[in-house]
Amino acid sequence: MSVSFDSSAFLATCSGRPGVYRMFDADARLLYVGKAKNLKKRLSSYFRKTGQAPKTAALVARIAQVETTITANETEALLLEQTLIKEWRPPYNILLRDDKSYPYVFLSDGEFPRLGIHRGAKKAKGRYFGPYPSALAIRESLSLLQKTFLVRQCEDSYYRNRTRPCLQYQIKRCKGPCVGLVSPEEYAEDVRHSVMFLEGRSNALSEELSASMEKASMALEFERAAELRDQISMLRRVQDQQSMEGGSGDVDVVAVMLNPGGACVHLISVRGGRVLGSKNFFPQVAIEEEGGEVLMAFLAQYYLGNAERDLPSELIVNVQHEDFSTLIEAVESLRGRSLSISLRVRGTRARWQQLAVTNAEQALAARLANRQHLAERFEALATVLEMDEPPQRMECFDISHSSGEATVASCVVFGPEGPLKSDYRRFNIEGVTPGDDYAAMHQALTRRFSKIKDGEGKLPDVLLVDGGKGQLAMAREVLQELAVPDLILLGVAKGTTRKPGLEVLYLNDAEHEFTLPGNSPALHLIQQIRDESHRFAITGHRARRGKARRTSTLEEVAGIGPKRRRELLNHFGGLQELSRASAEEIAKAPGISKKLAELIYATLHSE
């Protein structure tokens, strides 16, 4: 129990009403946020002398201050709790890591609408279908629709400026509305069929297509009948694959599985009776957490923490929790929608539930197996580096450029559980001699570790740099300039043969040079982190270089500023399409005179 916190005095004045409590440490850092029907009763349970779970004991040992907020009822307390958790992400709360919005299929307005992927606020005019649990699930649906009904998926800026059909028309993935190869009536029918599929009305769609096929055959329109036959065949294959499809309504099936090594929540999204896909979540939990607590924390954060998230009419779960009724009331209060939570289900819903449980079990087993493998690599590296315990945080820096152009430095971060992608950083390098990797590394490290000097950010246990003695010396110089506390420096050079497995390693002062066997788990970890840093740097460099090259040619044209360049590229759908346009076509763009259009055309086509 904390020696700096007088729990008896605090509890003597604590209210017995519903509310939210916040626990802080001696440095005023928020440790935990909780809610209670009876604040005094709930908080008293933390300060019992016996029977505390390890996680609770560790929390209580750090408490220096507790603050409470009284609310009108439990529902209000739950809503406030979720707001505070989302804002502060306290370390002792069960946290939902992946809270980004799910993608939707978007169907735009207009005579020839397009299908595409959409995330975020629904501001554009059109229809939204979903949400889909992953980008992969939505791409599968869009691919099927493109093959079956040939509705366009190109951006409007690209569509408006076509003068001949693109490759999608040639491979029978589009009917060419951009150049008038399909009538508005025929295209509208394809769009209507796509909507029926997205709404989950596959059976009705198949029946309608079958009737149309028979009608076309009777009219001796055999080409049209064959087209309809292919569409029906494609739909039936989907229905055969979608063995879980059945029933109606919008349902999310959520199952939680626990293991001493972690937890997994598996979510299956069903809309209109059709399973759209599924996704795994791995919340951080203590060993003693119960399934109901983990599930309740997940559901509250998932459905109350994002007002834009699509809400089903029913949740099917695999464990019970006493606060489900409070969650239902909170959802109705916040979202204005009714919600039911079911545990005992039959038929199709029971199959969905069992599948969610099975998927959660398998995903957790696979994650734990991978984590164990990674832990062995960390332990092996600790042995090689003569550390008392495995490193908890490793950072690796790499530089990428093309002959000095668009130089980007990457910083990737790994912990015992794998890559910490939310901590990844890229640095656009400016003001150095093109191609000077040492100066680029100096700038990147200075920008990164200046935050440590200013009291921000986390200090790694091991710092890797992709390079030999020179890069390692540069890293040492930066750390000394910034007076960064001691940490282990490791340089990774490719060796004379530049083959994987034959890397030369340099430790700290670069005087200690060594190699590791090709089958060394420690070397495999170093390679994994180095390769990830290389990948992250290259993707950043390519994006920066591509952006620069798209605009660099136009920068040579007098009278074209950044805003007009951007508008011009958006109008034509990119520099490539702009280059194909005639001077007359360029002059039709907003804000472009005939004289300026001729100048742009001449610049783009000069040798």
Swiss-Prot record:
A molecular function (GO) term: excinuclease ABC activity
Domain of life (superkingdom): Bacteria
Pfam families in the record: GIY-YIG (PF01541), HHH_5 (PF14520), UVR (PF02151), UvrC_RNaseH (PF22920), UvrC_RNaseH_dom (PF08459)
One GO cellular component term: excinuclease repair complex
Principal location listed in the UniProt entry: cytoplasm
Annotated ranges, domain UVR: 203-238
InterPro entries: GIY-YIG_endonuc (IPR000305), GIY-YIG_endonuc_sf (IPR035901), GIY-YIG_UvrC_Cho (IPR047296), Hlx-hairpin-Hlx_DNA-bd_motif (IPR003583), RuvA_2-like (IPR010994), UVR_dom (IPR001943), UVR_dom_sf (IPR036876), UvrABC_protein_C (IPR050066)
Localisation: Cytoplasm
UniProt keyword terms in alphabetical order: Cytoplasm, DNA damage, DNA excision, DNA repair, Excision nuclease, SOS response
GO biological process: nucleotide-excision repair; SOS response
Statement: the UniProt record of this protein carries the keyword DNA repair: yes
GIY-YIG domain residues: 16-94
Subunit structure and binding partners: Interacts with UvrB in an incision complex.
PANTHER family attached to this UniProt entry: UVRABC SYSTEM PROTEIN C, UVRC/OXIDOREDUCTASE
Similarity remark: Belongs to the UvrC family.
NCBIfam families on file: PRK00558.1-5 (NF001824), uvrC (TIGR00194)
Biological role: The UvrABC repair system catalyzes the recognition and processing of DNA lesions. UvrC both incises the 5' and 3' sides of the lesion. The N-terminal half is responsible for the 3' incision and the C-terminal half is responsible for the 5' incision.
Protein name (record): UvrABC system protein C
Source species of the chain: Ectopseudomonas mendocina (strain ymp) (Pseudomonas mendocina)
